[in-house]
Design a protein with these regions (language model features):
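Positively charged n-region of N-terminal signal peptides that target proteins for export
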Residues: 1-4
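C-terminal motif of bacterial Sec signal peptides marking the signal peptidase cleavage site
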Residues: 16-19
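Bacterial signal peptide processing site
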Residues: 21-23
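Low-complexity, Pro/Thr/Ser/Glu-rich flexible segments characteristic
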Residues: 25-61
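N-terminal binding-site loop/beta-alpha segment at the start of enzyme catalytic domains
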Residues: 55-143, 260-262
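Short, acidic/polar
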Residues: 94-106, 153-167, 216-217
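CE4/NodB-like, metal-dependent polysaccharide N-deacetylase domain
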Residues: 158-179, 195-199
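Beta/alpha (TIM)-barrel catalytic core signal, keyed to glycine-rich beta->alpha loops juxtaposed to Asp/Glu
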Residues: 181-342
Length: 342
């Protein structure tokens, strides 16, 4: 009897264990299927980002160096700083004219101011900037200030940089450029600007009046920081296309001094039949057509003026655009003719 009872209990335990194993296998299979489904759903959902994430990725894409943003009126320099593409030049402006012109340029929304030690008006530029800041028109960070080191200062570039900072009344200068090619000592002057970048005194550095590709390359090969900008005489009759193509390989952008042709020469361009015809079609002035051409062609423009009305006119070039045909007709005006001999 005891043997029968023991056999019965043993069989019962065997059947119970078998049942548990079957249930465990079933649950494991169910969990595996569920995990597989979740994995598939996850893979399918990862094929496409949500719209918000896609937009976020789009908005964080880096801005391409040297490409003009005509909507915001800026260009990203190879130094990593954004620069306005239209501004005010101050060549030949007296102290009072300069201060008034810079103030009105800032008042009208301009944020690029160009001066130079040799112009003798850096202090006036500084006063106008401080006035605009004090009146809440803009902040220092919103203004892009360019000045230039004159050739006689190349022997002691470090002192020249400090002197410009003091005259401008600024803690840093957005862009300093060598005013002219001078092979005897421009490399040393440029190296002084490189040191000033490392010290936080300058943010970007560049060149002016280098018209020969070999001359530009000479300085680049002897220095460390590639010029962010080359400022040359550039206008519709002297478009500097070959030089611009050459410096583009370095990520260097072209800036035009005398973008309207220069004092004593502007009327020649203003009266050009092609320019007049396009101006009439857009109900704009010849100056506005020329400046718009510069921006669409990839030239930063710094027209000078002591007349607040003209300053406002020069800045008001973002409410229209030139067609491809109009750009081609204007580009065809190139005569490779310089009006100044610097």
């Amino acid at each position: 009897m005891k043997k029968l009872l023991s056999l019965f209990l043993t069989l019962t335990m065997i059947f119970s264990l078998a049942a548990c194993g079957t249930q465990a296998d079933t649950e494991s299979s169910s969990e595996s299927t569920s995990a597989s489904q979740q994995s598939t759903e996850s893979a399918e959902s990862s094929d496409e980002l949500p719209a918000s994430e896609e937009n976020s990725a789009e908005s964080t894409r880096p801005v391409e160096t040297g490409v003009f943003d005509l909507e915001n009126g800026t260009v990203m320099l190879n130094s990593g700083y954004e620069m306005p593409i239209i501004g005010l030049g101050t060549f030949r402006l007296s102290d009072s004219e300069c201060e008034n012109s810079v103030y009105h340029a800032l008042l009208y929304g301009g944020r690029l101011i160009d001066t130079a030690r040799i112009y003798g008006n850096e202090e006036a530029v500084g006063r106008a900037i401080q006035r605009a800041i004090d009146e809440g028109i803009c902040t220092r960070e919103e203004i892009f200030v360019t000045t230039k080191m004159w050739t006689s200062d190349y022997e002691d570039g470090d002192a020249a940089i400090d002197a410009s900072l003091e005259r401008l009344g600024l803690d840093y200068i957005d862009l300093m450029i060598l005013h002219h090619s001078q092979p005897s000592n421009d490399v040393e002057a440029y190296q002084a600007m490189e040191r000033a970048v490392a010290d936080g005194k300058l943010r970007s550095i560049g060149l002016s009046n280098y018209y020969d590709p070999e001359d530009f390359d000479r300085l680049v090969e002897a220095t460390t920081i590639v010029p962010a900008l080359l400022q040359n005489e550039t206008h519709l009759y002297h478009q500097s296309r070959e030089m611009k193509e050459h410096i583009a390989q370095y990520g260097t952008v072209m800036e035009s001094w005398f973008p309207l042709g220069g004092r004593g020469q502007t009327q020649i361009l203003f009266d050009d039949p092609t320019i007049v015809s396009i101006a009439e079609a857009h109900d704009k002035t010849s100056a506005q057509i020329i400046l718009r051409w510069h921006l669409q062609a990839g030239n930063i423009a710094i027209p000078g003026s002591s007349n607040p009305d003209h300053i406002l006119e020069n800045l008001s070039i973002f409410d229209f655009s030139l067609s491809d045909e109009e750009m081609e007709n204007l580009t065809a005006l190139d005569r490779k003719e310089r009006f100044a001999d610097y």
